[in-house]
């Protein structure tokens, strides 16, 4: 972190500031007292006031109990960002933000000193945390921006001030909050309006919902079929091999992910990489160092040569369809088992979307479908071609069903919205000795 004087922290953040003896500045920021390092500023949010003493014992230079946690984090993130000449990339979109961020970070790191959001730090707390990791020599910052309402991306952009924006795949997500996919697009496209003149926006080719928000003074790069960065060929086994046309340059790249849907995320990342002026001919240097965030496309061995695909971080109709495609690609003759939890925030059409995903399981050749959660019952209604279909209202009630139906040698997908906590299922399956 670029150091901040404690006098400035006190001016920026109304509240109670407890300063360690002799401390004059902070060299890091933390909101989890267990992770505090000497010299950090500990910001007490969500009940963190109880841990102020622990943070100081661990060496914090100061502890802040802010009057307004969101405002304090924004002010601190903005203060660090304003001291840096780093180029900031902002990523929005309905699905694929975190994986695209992970791929872009891997591509950039061999060439420029890069800071990227950890996990899915993309809200009013997480984005400033990313910015406070900027060091004096940081050259590129990759900031993820989530949205739960109109105006939120605009506010996050006021803090991060990106010069390059990326909108990932659009689709029916957060409909409970926005009502229509057009309003989802409006929210995600706020990043276009926040870019400076001469900035660059990267977006999916053919995404008509975003076209009304484009500006004459912002450059546009498109990725996907018909775009500036497009996929010519794809194959995968333990690695994905992509042949790409990137701004007229033919690239052959090997990535250490396996799924076709991450190939689309890689195209988006390559477009941003090009917008940063990094050498396309050297993109392979980072391609095999992609480290996807936790609970995304994780593969673990199961008994009898089986495989668990743990993709339980989150879900919407687009990512569910992609995960089922990936299940088929990775099965290699194994029996297909899908454990699917609710897809949250889809609004009044949620039953329709769940039914469509259920139909997709049937088309994919899934032989066992275990649906978990009140909305997940809709999967069963669409999955008429699946041999064994079972539903449980909670994850806990689904565990006995899972143990009764899963056999050695199965290829099993676990996926659902974050609110379902399906990592419990994945951990239970993975705990069975191989």
Residue ranges and their predicted role:
Residues 91, 97, 294-298, 419-425, ...:
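ATP-dependent carboxylate/acyl-activation modules
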Residues 9, 40, 55, 76, ...:
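Residue-level signal for inorganic ion chemistry
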Residues 64-67, 389-398:
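Short acidic-hydrophobic, aromatic-tinged amphipathic segments that line or gate anion-handling sites
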Residues 69-203, 209-217, 404, 427-433:
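Phosphate-binding loop of NTP-binding sites
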Residues 292-295, 312-386, 391, 433:
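Active-site beta-alpha connecting loops in nucleotide-dependent enzymes
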Residues 11-16, 166-307, 334, 359-362, ...:
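Acidic, Mg2+-coordinating active-site environments of NTP-dependent enzymes
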Residues 1-79, 330-331, 359-360, 364-378, ...:
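N-terminal leader/targeting and accessory segments in enzymes
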Residues 399-405:
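Short amphipathic alpha-helix with an adjacent loop that forms part of the alpha/beta core around
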């Amino acid at each position: 972190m670029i150091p901040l004087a404690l006098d400035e922290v006190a001016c920026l953040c109304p509240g109670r500031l407890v300063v360690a003896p002799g401390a004059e500045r902070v060299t890091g920021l933390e909101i989890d007292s267990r992770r505090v390092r000497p010299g950090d500023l500990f910001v007490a949010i969500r009940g963190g006031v109880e841990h102020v003493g622990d943070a100081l014992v661990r060496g914090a230079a100061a502890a802040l109990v802010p009057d307004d946690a969101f405002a304090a984090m924004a002010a601190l993130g903005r203060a660090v960002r304003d001291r840096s000449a780093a180029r900031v990339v902002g990523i929005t979109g309905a699905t694929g933000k975190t994986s695209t961020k992970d791929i872009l970070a891997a591509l950039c790191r061999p060439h420029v000193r890069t800071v990227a959001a950890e996990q899915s730090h993309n809200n009013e707390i997480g984005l400033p945390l990313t910015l406070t990791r900027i060091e004096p020599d940081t050259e590129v910052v990759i900031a993820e921006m989530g949205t739960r309402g109109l105006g939120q991306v605009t506010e996050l952009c006021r803090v991060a001030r990106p010069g390059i924006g990326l909108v990932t795949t659009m689709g029916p997500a957060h409909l409970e909050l926005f009502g229509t996919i057009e309003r989802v697009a409006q929210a995600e496209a706020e990043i276009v309006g926040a870019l400076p003149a001469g900035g660059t926006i990267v977006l999916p080719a053919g995404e008509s919902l975003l076209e009304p928000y484009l500006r004459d003074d912002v450059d546009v790069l498109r990725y996907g079929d018909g775009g500036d960065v497009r996929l010519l060929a794809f194959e995968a086994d333990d690695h994905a091999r992509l042949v790409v046309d990137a701004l007229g340059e033919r690239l052959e790249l090997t990535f250490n992910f396996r799924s076709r849907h991450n190939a689309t995320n890689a195209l988006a990342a390559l477009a941003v990489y090009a917008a940063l002026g990094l050498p396309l001919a050297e993109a392979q240097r980072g391609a095999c160092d992609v480290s996807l965030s936790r609970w995304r496309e994780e593969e673990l061995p199961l008994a009898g040569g089986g495989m668990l695909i743990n993709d339980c971080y989150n879900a919407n109709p687009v990512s569910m369809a992609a995960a089922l495609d990936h299940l088929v690609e990775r099965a290699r003759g194994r029996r297909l088992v899908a454990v699917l939890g609710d897809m949250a925030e889809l609004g009044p059409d949620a039953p329709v979307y769940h039914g469509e995903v259920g139909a997709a399981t049937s088309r994919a050749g899934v032989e066992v479908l275990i649906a978990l959660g009140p909305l997940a019952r809709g999967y069963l209604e669409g999955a008429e071609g699946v041999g064994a279909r079972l539903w449980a209202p909670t994850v806990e009630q689904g565990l006995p069903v899972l143990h009764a139906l899963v056999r050695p040698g199965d290829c099993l997908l676990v996926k659902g919205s974050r609110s379902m906590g399906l990592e419990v299922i994945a951990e239970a399956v993975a705990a069975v000795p191989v």
